[in-house]
Amino acid sequence: MTDLFQNMFFLYGAQGPTAFSNGPTCVEVQGDWIVDAIATMQKTGKQTIEATKDAETSWHALVTELSDKTLFPGTDSWYMGANIPGKPREQLNFPGGFPRYEKECRGALDGWKGFVVA
């Protein structure tokens, strides 16, 4: 999800484990999270969900921190956005492993950490 876009869920997006994981498995976990989020919203009478800017910034910082512990930052690869002249170099995929990614996502459902839900 992205700040300023209420109820906009998207799969296989930037800073997910996309290129570093099995595609169908990734989409299944993300899809299950979306279904669970919507079901929880319905049960609690909520109609909108939006990621906070702070959550977006924190996620980017986590992805950067994890990436900085690898050799990725020193490579000229599309993983770092180096294939587009002038584009800022940053990690485009979650490099923390799929189990951690799933745990981070599931944790966000507990109390809607990082979201405004109304």
Model feature map: region roles:
Residues 1-10:
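FAD-site-proximal beta/loop scaffold in flavoenzymes
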Residues 9-118:
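C-terminal, flexible cofactor-proximal segment of oxidoreductases
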